[in-house]
Amino acid sequence: MTSTLQTLAFKLAPPSREAGSGQLEPCSDVQGRRYEVVPSVVCSMCCLFGIIYCFFGYRCFKAVLFLTGLMFGSVIIFLLCYKERVLDTQLSVEASVGIGLGIGTLCGLVTMLVRSVGLFMVGLLLGLLVGIGTLIGMEELSSNPPRSVWVPLGVLLGLGMLFAVLTLQWQRCFTTLSTAVFGAAVIVVATDYFVELFALVRYIYERVKTGPREPVCWTTWVVLGAWPALALLGVLVQWRVTAEGYSHTKVMISRQQRRVQLMRIRQKEERRESSRKKKRKQPQSAQHTHAAKALHPEPAYRRKPNPIRRFDGDVLSPSYIQSFRDRQVDGRAYPVGGLMPSGHTSVDMDYDCGSTVPLTAGVGPHVRV
């Protein structure tokens, strides 16, 4: 692993200036190039990955978010661990790679699960690539390009943040554009190894560092010109073929609809079970009600008698009732049918006190009520 990384570092290192043989030197040393097995295999896999990323990026939306977070996290943590001292010790390349991959995997999971974070990283990647193209254009088109370190830093961060915000606003459009541009860049870098052993990568690295301008071979410009062409082709293919009729928002909505449908199905099943339980309980309750009716038969309906109509004269005072009792006591002293003093009437106490018969009568024979 260490020898492979050292080989890649040697390939990426700028050529020595001592043996300067003129401006055509970058194109002259073609026969002396030697290709290693491991870098060739890695570049071939990256080329295949770039093709999928360029032409099927938006279709593989979740995978794009995961790989973007994995790449950012792994590269940043690897550089920090390899260049800086951690706990007063210089970590080896293998340890730095392992730590970078571990933390990069966590970053990839975060960008995949939190969609807004993933879209922000996708837009940031697009802005960085556009910033690199801007720096190359400034270097070649300007007669006196700026050599300050803050210029590339400001261009990269400014364009990165701008495209990150735009990606959050127009998600489908800028996600398609970002995947096409990044996939084309990966294809170009992998091809550059087989053409010039990363001469284009060294040139871009010097432009970011604001280093002195060095002559490059015409094949470098051909490889660099393939980048925007492949990016445009990737956008067209995704727009018309691979991403047509597909939307990452519909995927989220369809999952929510599935959950809602499952909830509805569960509610229907619960209702059916509750109705079955009610039907089972109804015969038992009916039997209990019949038994209760047999034990406690309902009384027959009886019509309430009409209330007796009373008048003002029907109300008897307690004094009259007491006089009735006194007369009854007096009447027992005489035989039935005997004579009593005139002006009084013999009253039987079995008589209902609520009767409408007058209590006194005129002078005459005894009247038994």
From Swiss-Prot:
Pfam families per record: TM7S3_TM198 (PF13886)
Keywords from the UniProt entry: Membrane, Transmembrane, Transmembrane helix
GO BP terms, alphabetized: positive regulation of canonical Wnt signaling pathway
Membrane topology designation: Multi-pass membrane protein
Region feature (Disordered): 266-308
Signal sequence, start to end: none
Protein name: Transmembrane protein 198
Lineage of the organism: Eukaryota, Metazoa, Chordata, Craniata, Vertebrata
